[in-house]
Amino acid sequence: MIAMLRTYATFTSSLPDDQQEKDGEIVIPGGRNILGRLHDGLARRGFSVSEIKQHEDYGWCFEIVAPSCRIWCLIQFCEPWLLITDRCGGLLKRLLGVSDDSTHRKVCETFQDIIAEDSSFSELRWFTKAEFEETKGQGGHDKPVK
C-alpha cells in the first residue's frame, strides 16, 4: 500500500501577532515569526533552507533545497494558521513514473516533530490538498503520512 502524504497543516500559535497595518490595510502579513521558528527548526535538523520571503500580501515562504527536489513552504493565516508544503522539481522523474516523495515526507514529518515539541504551537491537524479544500480545514489527521 502506498502511503498518502498530507501536505497541508493547520495549527494555532501563542506567538505574538507580527502583522503590521497602516490606515486599516495590512502592509506586512503576520506569521513571519512563526515561519521563522519552523525554518530554524529545520535548519537545526540539517535541512538546507533558503531565506524567508514575503509571499504576495498574505504570507511568508521559503524553500528547502535537496539533491532531488525543492520543497516550497508557505504559511498564511486562515484561522488557524495554514502551512502548505509543495514539492518542486523532479518533473522528468515523475513523467517517467519514478516518483520519490521521501524528501517531502521527511520534511512534513520534521514539521510534525518541531510543532509537537514547541509549547507555543497546538491543535496540529494534517490534510491532503483535496481534504483541506473539501472540509475547509475542519477535521484532519494527527500525522502527515497515512
Kindly give the residue locations of the regions a language model identified.
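N-terminal low-complexity, intrinsically disordered segments
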Residues: 1-43, 47
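A short linear-motif detector with a strong N-terminal bias
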Residues: 28, 40-43, 51-53, 61-64, ...
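Amphipathic, interaction-prone secondary-structure segments
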Residues: 32-36, 48-76
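Solvent-exposed amphipathic alpha-helical surface segments
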Residues: 41, 45, 49, 92-93, ...
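Amphipathic protein-protein interaction modules
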Residues: 61-115
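Intrinsically disordered, low-complexity regulatory regions enriched in serine/threonine/proline
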Residues: 100-146
